[in-house]
Amino acid sequence: MIPVPTGARVWLATGYTDMRRGFPSLALQVQEVLRKDPLSGHLFVFRGRRSDLVKLIWHDGQGACLFTKRLERGRFIWPSVAGEAVTISSAQLSYLLSGIDWRNPQEALRPTRVG
């Protein structure tokens, strides 16, 4: 789990994002579409079209951070609000990254084998 700094908010970018993007273009999306400051220390979470891949970006005061996670099975649960950003708690982010429905936590699917 990514340690969320005290006072940092977690923002989910609704809709789909091109997962070929890196930190610079995701930061530009945060700035232009979400109207937030990508260097604020807050975490911004994006998902791909198939909903099995997410990317998180944040600036920790020393540099830009990019985290990527792909689920082996299942899909990331995402809000259906279009064109906006939704804020969630750090606990909900932990559920989200574990493949658990962060709105109604249940047991996660675990991989049974590697390869």
Please report, for each region that a protein language model flagged, where it lies by residue:
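Polybasic/polar functional segments that serve as interface/processing modules
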Residues: 1-115
